């Protein structure tokens, strides 16, 4: 699955 940081930080 994807991580939450990919949409938050990136």
Swiss-Prot record:
The keyword Nucleotide-binding does not apply. Keywords: Amidation, Cytoplasmic vesicle, Secreted. GO terms for biological process: neuropeptide signaling pathway. GO terms for cellular component: cytoplasmic vesicle; extracellular region. Its main location: secreted. InterPro entries: Bombesin. The modification Methionine amide is found at residue 10. It is found in: Secreted; Cytoplasmic vesicle, Secretory vesicle lumen. It comes from the Eukaryota. Coiled coil: none annotated. Belongs to the bombesin/neuromedin-B/ranatensin family. Stimulates the release of gastrin and other gastrointestinal hormones. This is Neuromedin-C.
């Amino acid at each position: 699955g994807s991580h939450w940081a990919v949409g938050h930080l990136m």
